[in-house]
């Protein structure tokens, strides 16, 4: 019912509302608030509560400018993905340990109704949060330079200050048992107080059809959460919720191994990248 209402307000009635900017703003803002209210629970870790209390992606973006019907749809997809991912992270029950390293890095997993199996990476990075945010958001397209699991990331479209459509080409994995995949996703990034959330989910983008020789996989809902480590603001607590449908026929054991290992490797590659950039800045 809610999605039908959104379509009516932001889609089917677009021509009628295009000369009624104030009403159009109010309609979409109300829908954003209702999405938040229905998705969020009452009990969650402090950093999630902080983001939830102050997060209204639709509201903040629509106050800045008006968007096309398709752009509004992308914004809504990003908002729903963020709230769904935060809802999954806020539920502390049912997580099982998949992998743990001596330095404390760990990957947990659980099965979520209507989503499937999700993986949760928990690490502490010895770098300030702003450095991670800059690397993961501002320099997103450079990820292929330091993460061998990613061949390329391109921003296909930017919508406002928080939302982008991306195409990601992933390298083969598990000794080529898992061939190359690509993903088309809508991503949104929110900074609220001392917490940053980077969320995403698979979407359709007409200008990026499926590529020959590459399986189009789907992400989502997924998110990365960054916030200063309590008592050590120069360090960052990094949480990555990963939900992926790799498509194709693959044994579950292979999928579980690939995804948990991918998260562990990502943490190591990210640390090396940040250490390298810090050293370069120190020499300048």
Swiss-Prot record:
GO BP: any one term: intracellular cholesterol transport
Domain (START) ranges: 66-279
Biochemical pathway: Steroid metabolism; cholesterol metabolism
Subcellular compartments: Mitochondrion
Keyword annotations from UniProtKB, A to Z: Lipid transport, Lipid-binding, Mitochondrion, Phosphoprotein, Steroidogenesis, Transit peptide, Transport
Transit peptide limits: 1-62
Keyword Transit peptide included in the entry's annotation: yes
MF term (GO), any: cholesterol transfer activity
Superkingdom, taxonomy of origin: Eukaryota
Subunit annotation: May interact with TSPO.
Summary of the function given for this chain in its UniProt record: Plays a key role in steroid hormone synthesis by enhancing the metabolism of cholesterol into pregnenolone. Mediates the transfer of cholesterol from the outer mitochondrial membrane to the inner mitochondrial membrane where it is cleaved to pregnenolone.
Protein name, per record: Steroidogenic acute regulatory protein, mitochondrial
